[in-house]
Amino acid sequence: PIIEACPAPNKHSLMSLMHSFYCFGTVAVVLVSTLALRIFGSESWRVIAAIWALLPLGNALFFSRVPIYSMTEVHGSMPVKRLLSMPLFWALLMLMFAAGACEMSMSQWASAFAESGLGVSKTVGDLLGVCMFSLLMGIARFLRSRVNVKTSIFSLMIGCGALCAASYLLAALAPHPALALLGCGLCGFSVGILWPGVYSMAGELCPTGGTAMFAFLALAGDIGSSGGPTLIGLIAGSH
């Protein structure tokens, strides 16, 4: 909602750029934490976690000084009851749920997938699995923010959804572990547009949704992010 409230001409690009830093931040955390654990030993993980905790604290202090423009000042705010009665809103919720499930299912299992498929250590699995997934996801979002693509966000979402399905099939059915790992990376690239794309679509199609709409969308994404990996774990554990 902060990006959608910014008085900027190309909010789709800004949304993708903002989400790309989440991906690059994940890569940085994995690399720096791995290096720190190598140097200082595994018993230093509490100190490392405490140091990383300073980042959200700094963000909180920073945003406490940032003036935030309200979207509803222009369009007016829609009542929550009316929002919940809109079929379009429920379609956006399902898209957000699917985006979270597709993204986090592969992200959470990429490390274990690399370990078991390639027979490497957990450290190498994190670097090959999580870092490659997050890096390609960040690249997709960064390219979306910088390249002047005339294709609509709706067409991009459909194309990325098809690529995501193909990457999951490649990861599951590839005859060689290296090809399966490539599927993990392609999945990261394909899901890069989905999460920020749903936010942009919601702000464009329902500008009067207000903060409540984005809160519900975030909730749907979080449920998908937690439910997707859990379901995969249950299915994998039963076979």
Language-model segment annotations:
Residues 1-8, 192-206:
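Intracellular juxtamembrane helix-capping segments at the cytosolic ends
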Residues 9-68:
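Helix-loop-helix hairpin linking two adjacent transmembrane segments in secondary transporters
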Residues 32-41, 114-115, 147-148, 203, ...:
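Interfacial helix-cap and linker-helix signal at transmembrane-aqueous boundaries
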Residues 68-92:
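Juxtamembrane intracellular "pre-TM" segments in multi-pass secondary transporters
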Residues 86-138:
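Extracytoplasmic gate region of multi-pass secondary transporters
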Residues 102-114, 143, 198, 202, ...:
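Hydrophobic/aromatic end-of-helix segments at the C-terminal termini of transmembrane alpha-helices
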Residues 151-198:
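C-terminal transmembrane helical hairpin of 12-TM major facilitator-type secondary transporters
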Residues 207-239:
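A late C-terminal transmembrane helix in Major Facilitator Superfamily
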